[in-house]
Amino acid sequence: MTAPSTPKPSRKKPKPASPAKPATPREKASLHPRNRHQGRYDFPQLIKSTPELGQFVILNPYGKESIDFADPAAVRVFNRALLKAFYGIAHWDIPADFLCPPVPGRADYVHFLADLLASHNQGEIPRGAAVRVLDVGVGANCIYPLIGYSDYRWQFLGSDIDSTALAAAKAIVQANDLNKAISLRQQGNPKQILTGLLDSTERFDLTMCNPPFHASLDEATRGSQRKWRALGKADPKRKLPVLNFGGQARELWCEGGEIRFVSQLISESASVGQQVLWFSTLVSKASNLPAIESALKKAGALESQVVEMSQGQKQSRFVAWTFKDKAQQQAWSQERWMRKN
């Protein structure tokens, strides 16, 4: 999505937000306990269910089976195999040059959001169609709705400004007969994120977002080159994709970068604050958190959290915030989940 100038929310100034408090970090490289992707992958089993993966399997420098993560085709087929083997998604494909995200990290985000809902439901994760989630910027891959429905049977609405991405996501949804669980909607104004997207009667228990985190195409390319070096693929004689793991320009960068996009998302969330229990977004850089906390205070968020995650050598996090006080949060859970679980 393309981020414009951040609009100023027209609303009364509420009580100051509780400071965003980082969760206690877990052990390095530890996935969420409910994440299906613990340990090494059983490549023979993956190849059995997705035979086309076989042509991409190699031995890494440690003699273990893997794939070449510098090859977008290999990553795409690997994701297809994982989604089929672990989540029962029989048909999955995306157009060339669209973001092909690593599945384990995306699953972690979903599981930690489930924990957030459980904290309002006597420690029990609310499951089924009673829970509605908005995926802001669903992309062609439709990854969060697929995981969230498979693991928790939640209902999803995926939004995007890109009609090609939505067409690809729709093809995935229809091919897997998930039309009743996953809906898609185009944000008609590419300069807006939430504004004008939702009906006034719609309610969502969660929103989630994987924002564009670079401020320019050049910055995105440099970030990709750093990843290639980390993967040991920075061979100047080898032609590599410009952007790591694919990704259209608007998926990876926007004017002002992550801070501007997330600040706008927060600002716009204030206008629909009573329609959503918890908003959330991934944040790629910990150094962006102070600016994001300032945006939360400015928007009038009453509570916020920073949840740290780890996948292999990668450290990631998401920020969650709400415009509801404790009493309103409790009333929400009683009305929407406790009667239906």
From Swiss-Prot:
One of its GO terms (biological process) is rRNA base methylation. Signal peptide: none annotated. InterPro entries: METTL16/RlmF, rRNA_lsu_MeTfrase_F, SAM-dependent_MTases_sf. Its main location: cytoplasm. It holds the Pfam family Methyltransf_10. GO terms for molecular function: 23S rRNA (adenine(1618)-N(6))-methyltransferase activity. Keywords: Cytoplasm, Methyltransferase, rRNA processing, S-adenosyl-L-methionine, Transferase. It catalyses: adenosine(1618) in 23S rRNA + S-adenosyl-L-methionine = N(6)-methyladenosine(1618) in 23S rRNA + S-adenosyl-L-homocysteine + H(+). It is found in: Cytoplasm. GO terms for cellular component: cytoplasm. Residues 1-41 are annotated as: Disordered. Specifically methylates the adenine in position 1618 of 23S rRNA. NCBIfam families: PRK11727.1. Belongs to the methyltransferase superfamily. METTL16/RlmF family. This is Ribosomal RNA large subunit methyltransferase F. The gene is rlmF.
